[in-house]
């Protein structure tokens, strides 16, 4: 969005202005407290997921974009988990449907730490592999509970495969990373239902992927899950932006 002050235009967060200046906001404002909500919004539409009446967990909540999206789509309760502190949006902190769990590492959260079995959980974490998160998250889900996870190649590929500024551009590495995560999920009690790419890139320009999984004792990978096609489509669309 654009902020105007005495004919000056600012389009970046963190700009400062005199106390007595007139400020106008122009342009379309974001529907959620952060752009993370756009990722879950696409996942819900593409994977045909509903939030109505569900108890959810937002793992890697940060500002709370995913939490906001869940609530706006009818979630009954959201546990917002993040190792950080002070980032979570004020309006969400005040929402009685939200349990804010800051300074909390999901790897050490057990069913005894929450009051409910989860119907749904999302994962959007950085500087840690999904392989460290899926096991603890599974223990919190009810049987048949579902998850949408962001697969981030920059945090899954080996250091030798990560380029400048932490960006992974090689499509073959993307396919390898996604395949590894899917294989891990299948080996650890999750069916893999669908795969799509995130509608927005990560902060440094990394393409990321959304995977839809389900807790089960008999894991399967749906035949419609086509890693190569999704990676190709992601690069075809997002590399132009």
PLM segments and residue spans:
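Short beta-strand element of Class I
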Residues: 76-79
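A short glycine-rich, Lys/Arg-flanked "PGG" loop and its adjoining helix->strand segment in the class I
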Residues: 131-146
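Short, small-residue-biased leader/transition segments that mark boundaries at the very start
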Residues: 2-9
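Conserved SAM-binding loop of SAM-dependent methyltransferases across substrates and taxa
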Residues: 63-74
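Conserved class I S-adenosyl-L-methionine
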Residues: 52-62
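S-adenosyl-L-methionine
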Residues: 81-128, 132
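Flexible, glycine-/basic-rich loop-and-beta segments that form/coincide
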Residues: 207-241
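Short, glycine-/aromatic-enriched active-site segment of Class I SAM-dependent methyltransferases
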Residues: 153-169
């Amino acid at each position: 969005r654009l902020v105007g002050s005495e004919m000056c235009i600012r389009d970046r967060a963190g700009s400062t202005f005199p106390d007595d200046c007139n400020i106008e906001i122009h342009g379309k404002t974001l529907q959620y407290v952060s752009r993370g909500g756009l990722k879950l919004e696409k996942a819900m539409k593409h994977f045909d997921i509903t939030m109505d009446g569900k108890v959810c967990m937002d793992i890697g909540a940060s500002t709370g974009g995913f939490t906001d999206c869940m609530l706006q789509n009818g979630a009954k309760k959201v546990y917002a988990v993040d190792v950080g502190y002070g980032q979570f949006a004020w309006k969400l902190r005040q929402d009685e449907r939200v349990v804010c769990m800051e300074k909390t590492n999901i790897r050490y959260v057990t069913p005894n730490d929450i009051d409910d079995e989860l119907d749904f959980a999302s994962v959007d974490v950085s500087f840690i592999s999904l392989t460290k998160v899926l096991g603890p998250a599974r223990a919190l889900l009810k049987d048949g509970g579902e998850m949408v996870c962001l697969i981030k190649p920059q945090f899954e590929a080996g250091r030798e495969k990560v380029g400048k500024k932490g960006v992974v551009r090689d499509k073959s590495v993307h396919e390898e990373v996604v395949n590894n995560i899917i294989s891990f999920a299948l080996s650890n009690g999750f069916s893999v239902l669908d795969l799509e790419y995130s509608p927005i890139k990560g902060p440094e320009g990394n393409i990321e992927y959304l995977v839809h999984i389900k807790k089960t004792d008999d894991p399967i990978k749906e035949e419609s899950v086509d890693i190569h096609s999704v990676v190709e489509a992601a690069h075809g669309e997002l590399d132009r932006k």
